[in-house]
Amino acid sequence: MAKAKFERTKPHVNIGTIGHVDHGKTTLTAAITKVLADKYPDLNQSFAFDQIDKAPEEKARGITINISHVEYQTEKRHYAHVDAPGHADYIKNMITGAAQMDGAILVVAATDGPMPQTREHVLLARQVGVPYILVALNKADMVDDEEILELVEMEVRELLAAQEFDEEAPVVRVSGLKALEGDPKWVKSVEDLMDAVDESIPDPVRETDKPFLMPIEDVFTITGRGTVVTGRVERGIINVNEEVEITGIRPETTKTTVTGIEMFRKLLDQGQAGDNVGLLIRGIKREDVERGQVVIKPGTTTPHTEFEGQAYILSKDEGGRHTPFFNNYRPQFYFRTTDVTGVVTLPEGTEMVMPGDNTEMSVKLIQPVAMEEGLRFAIREGGRTVGAGRVTKIIK
C-alpha cells in the first residue's frame, strides 16, 4: 500500500488521551485508528492495541518516558495522537512536554466515574496549559442505567469546571472495545467522538504566526562584518533589516537590527520557526551578548527572576537524586540553552520532596531569564538532570 504523504493543506493538531490508568485510553486510541482507517482507507492505517500499549521509551530532557505516537486523519484535519499508558509516564510527559497537546480527550469509564487520577490529570492539564478538553465516556456499553450515565457525565462536567475548562464540552458515550470488535453502534460512537474532536478543539496557532524568538547558542565575530549570533528559531519569522531586542541573563535589554541571515552558509531574506540560523546584528560587540539570552521581536517577552513552577523530580532509578531535598534547595535551572542557579521554596505544608515526586515550587533565580508561562526547564546539579518542570506563574 502506498504511504499517505503528509499533506500540508490540512491543519495539523496534536492531541492525547488522558485519564485513569484502567479506563481504556489505549483501547480507545486503537479504536480511533481502526474506525478512521475503515472510514477513510486512503488516509489512514490502523494500529493494533499491543502496538500502542508497548510504548517505546523516549528521552525528553534526560527523562525516560514510555509514550506511543499514532497519527490519523479526518476529512478536516491531520492528527498526531499521544498515549502514555502509565500514570507516572503521563505525568512526566505533561511536565517535560515530550509531546505537547493542542487538546485532550479525557477518558472516563462509565462504570467507575472520575477517579483521583482523573482529577490529577485534569489539574495537570490546566497547569501545563492544555487549551481544551473534551470527554469520552468509555465502556458505555456496560452501563444500562441511563441515570448512572447522566450522573457520571455531571460529575465529569463539575471536574472540568473546577479547573476552568469548558463545562459545556462534548461528552461522547463510547466503547473502545466494542468499536474495535466492529460493532456498528459503537463504531459510530467513535466516529461521533472524532467529529466532536474536529469541532471542539480549536485550531492551534502555527509556530510561524507567533512573535519571533530565537535562543542564542553561540556568538562569534566575522571580521569586517560584525557579530553573529546562532541558534534555532523557536517561533515566528525574522526578516533582514528588522529590529530586534536581545534580552535575559543581563540586567539590560539591547536593541539592534538584523542585517543578515545565514543558513548552511547561504544568505537568506528570512528565517522561520525550526530553522538553524546565524543572525548578523548591527553595532553590537561580541562581549555584549552571550549564550542563554534570546533574540526577540521587540517588547514580546520579558526577563524575570521569580516564578512558580510544577516539576517532576527524577527517581534514583532514572538517574536522579538518591535523597530528598528541602526548602532553600539551590540547583541550576536550565532554560533553553543555559543554566541559571535558583533557590527553591516549597509549598506550605511540604517538608521535603522525594525522588520520583511531582511538586509545585517557587523559584528565585540569581540572573533574569526571558520567560513566559508554560516555558519548560530542566533542574540540574552540576550538569546532571535531576528534574524537569514548567513555569506555571510569573511572580516578578
Swiss-Prot record:
Query: Could you tell me which residues belong to the region G2?
Result: 62-66
Give the Pfam families listed for this entry. Answer: GTP_EFTU, GTP_EFTU_D2, GTP_EFTU_D3
Subcellular localization: Cytoplasm
Task: Cite the tr-type G domain residue spans from the record.
Answer: 10-205
Quaternary structure? Monomer.
- Origin superkingdom: Bacteria
What is the native source organism of this protein?
Answer: Nocardia farcinica (strain IFM 10152)
* Gene field: tuf
Quote the catalytic activity from the record.
GTP + H2O = GDP + phosphate + H(+)
Record: residues binding GTP: 19-26, 83-87, 138-141
Entry EC number(s): 3.6.5.3
Q: Which NCBIfam families match?
A: EF-Tu (TIGR00485), PRK00049.1 (NF000766), PRK12735.1 (NF009372), PRK12736.1 (NF009373), small_GTP (TIGR00231)
Segments for region (G3): 83-86
One GO molecular function term of this record is:
GTPase activity
- Family assignment? Belongs to the TRAFAC class translation factor GTPase superfamily. Classic translation factor GTPase family. EF-Tu/EF-1A subfamily.
Protein keywords = Cytoplasm, Elongation factor, GTP-binding, Hydrolase, Magnesium, Metal-binding, Nucleotide-binding, Protein biosynthesis
* Region annotation (G5) ranges: 175-177
CDD domains xref list: EF_Tu, EFTU_II, EFTU_III
UniProt entry tagged with the keyword Hydrolase: yes
- Residues recorded as binding Mg(2+), renumbered to this chain, are T26
**Protein's job:** GTP hydrolase that promotes the GTP-dependent binding of aminoacyl-tRNA to the A-site of ribosomes during protein biosynthesis.
Q: This chain belongs to which protein, by name?
A: Elongation factor Tu
> Which InterPro entries did the record assign?
EF-Tu_GTP-bd, EF-Tu_GTPase, EFTu-like_2, EFTU_2, G_TR_CS, P-loop_NTPase, Small_GTP-bd, T_Tr_GTP-bd_dom
Does Nucleotide-binding show up as a keyword for this record?
yes
